[in-house]
């Protein structure tokens, strides 16, 4: 203690601790008094701040000094061992003695040299009466310093892990090993437990019927080892660890199963806990959304939960009308039951929608526009197999073709030219303008073309500050329709005014398609892409020259009374949205165009549907439909009363 603090500092510290100097060196007493005085001197308790600072500095200095002295003593003890002392009087002993003295403090060294004594003649060597100090016995190996190196390859080395496992090994003293062996067996109902001696310590190996974290086992054991050392580890190779602890330097003490364990006796439940309960497969939901191209969270959730009903109790499955539905229902029934019970239904469906958007983004970047259109047609053909079933449905779709023929005699050429426009997507030749009076068929045709190719309709009659998010809807879309654009000045005074034409004039880069533009959605980062081509529909507004030159073609519409009357008398075309569907446009192309006009990948589908249409309606019947349209009659008057 004399090497820790100076005499004056020691007196100051003892005065602050209110202890007599006779107690100097009684570290436990000084520690207790220090904690008491900290509460007394602390400024928050009304004490003296200066006294508190002085007490802390002196006490911390004392602690550091005591630690340094202990370290020095340990170094001195470890300099040499008695077994290493050479024989006294030999040159080796002189060298060892010189090395031994180098560790002592400088002031204790003595560099004096003794005067040499006169040599005396010795006819005979007398036997030496001195001998070296006998070597001390080696201390027994202390196995409590670290976990046995022989077992490191079998255990987990994770420091912080939430993984739950069923196999553990605990390393502690012999005394605590006796206690923990019984406590662990009782607490965790171990399916197997064994105790192994390792020098002066004990290892306990055990398997639990249920999964636990290593930290939970460690905390339980610490409650019984407040002073004794403790190592607790999870086991990666249970049988390898157990068999190694049955060989030297380990000794098997006891185990709850006579004869121990053999490698083939380990069941999966022993190693991995209880059989894993089936969990909700988010990937299966995503695959379903990808197959049917669903990008609406709530529609996906509603559709998928329907599969929770048993297939044998499902009306659609029992009718056998839709083979695809029955296949998908059987595949997804078990997962749908889990989704129904899950608390993360929306999260699972949101991730599935993200997969759909990611797939769409990938296709937009990697596939050509012709390939994308072919893929869209394939999807429509799949829908036709489910929707266009039976004579009544086919006649309704043929009636829509007759109506479009009445709208434009060369409707097929118009559609083919438009498809070529959006497939080529040439800069400054990407947009058509549909212009005409109210109820002249502009929106009907534009919507059908939009559904044929796939895309979104946009409203740009809104204030300019709201435009960025409206335009962001066009992200990854094949085409767009700027619907019912309003201008400031119209040929007819009763037309309402709006910001549409003015906003369109400010979107020249969007219409031209020469450079990439930034598109953004809420909660999504901006992305640069060429804005998709499309159609602009408007009434008879005046268009500035800067906007007009950006339209590759302007299609003028006029009011045809017979078209309106035939629709009124054939309400199914509107109520069932047949006239606005992409299927109607695709059937129109199949009816009018030769097979060679279609891509080779879908020519077989085109041939099939041409045969289907020919079986239900011939040229004479179709001519009758056209005549009914021209006369403003019910298009299906001959077939439906």
Curated annotation (Swiss-Prot):
Can you summarize the PTM annotation of this record?
Phosphorylated on both serine and threonine residues. Small t antigen inhibits the dephosphorylation by the AC form of PP2A.
Looking at the UniProt feature table, which residue ranges are given for the DNA-binding region?
148-263
Q: What is this protein called?
A: Large T antigen
Indicate which residues the UniProt annotation says bind Zn(2+).
Answer: 314, 317, 325, 329
Q: Where in the cell is it found?
A: Host nucleus
Residues with PTM N-acetylmethionine: 1
Q: Which residue intervals define the domain J in the entry? A: 12-80
Q: Which residues carry this modification: Phosphothreonine?
A: 133
Q: Which reaction does it catalyse?
A: Couples ATP hydrolysis with the unwinding of duplex DNA by translocating in the 3'-5' direction; ATP + H2O = ADP + phosphate + H(+)
Disulfide partners: none
Instruction: Give binding positions for ATP.
Output: 436-443
Instruction: Describe the task this protein carries out.
Output: Isoform large T antigen is a key early protein essential for both driving viral replication and inducing cellular transformation. Plays a role in viral genome replication by driving entry of quiescent cells into the cell cycle and by autoregulating the synthesis of viral early mRNA. Displays highly oncogenic activities by corrupting the host cellular checkpoint mechanisms that guard cell division and the transcription, replication, and repair of DNA. Participates in the modulation of cellular gene expression preceeding viral DNA replication.
In what residue span(s) does the SF3 helicase domain sit? 410-572
Q: Where are the annotated segments for Disordered?
A: 114-136
Q: Which organism is it from?
A: KI polyomavirus (isolate Stockholm 350)
Question: PROSITE patterns recorded for this chain?
Answer: SF3_HELICASE_1, T_AG_OBD, ZF_LTAG_D1
Q: Could you read off the lineage of the organism from its UniProt record?
A: Viruses, Monodnaviria, Shotokuvirae, Cossaviricota, Papovaviricetes
* UniProt motif (LXCXE motif) ranges: 108-112
EC annotation?
5.6.2.4
GO biological process entries: DNA replication; symbiont-mediated perturbation of host cell cycle G1/S transition checkpoint; symbiont-mediated suppression of host innate immune response; symbiont-mediated suppression of host JAK-STAT cascade via inhibition of JAK1 activity; symbiont-mediated suppression of host type I interferon-mediated signaling pathway
Q: What is known of its domains?
A: The J domain is essential for multiple viral activities, including virion assembly, viral DNA replication, transformation and transcriptional activation.
**Which is one GO molecular function term here?**
ATP hydrolysis activity
Q: What Pfam families does the annotation carry? A: Polyoma_lg_T_C, T_Ag_DNA_bind
The record's keywords, sorted A to Z, are:
Acetylation, ATP-binding, DNA replication, DNA-binding, Early protein, G1/S host cell cycle checkpoint dysregulation by virus, Helicase, Host nucleus, Host-virus interaction, Hydrolase, Inhibition of host innate immune response by virus, Inhibition of host interferon signaling pathway by virus, Inhibition of host JAK1 by virus, Interferon antiviral system evasion, Isomerase, Magnesium, Metal-binding, Modulation of host cell cycle by virus, Nucleotide-binding, Oncogene, Phosphoprotein, Viral immunoevasion, Zinc, Zinc-finger
Major location (coarse)? host cell
Q: How does it assemble?
A: Forms homohexamers in the presence of ATP. Interacts with host HDAC1. Interacts (via LXCXE domain) with host RB1; the interaction induces the aberrant dissociation of RB1-E2F1 complex thereby disrupting RB1's activity. Interacts (via LXCXE domain) with host pRB-related proteins RBL1 and RBL2. Interacts (via C-terminus) with host TOP1 and POLA1 allowing DNA replication. Interacts with host TP53, inhibiting TP53 binding to DNA. Interacts with host preinitiation complex components TBP, TFIIA and TFIID to regulate transcription initiation.
Q: Does the keyword Magnesium apply?
A: yes
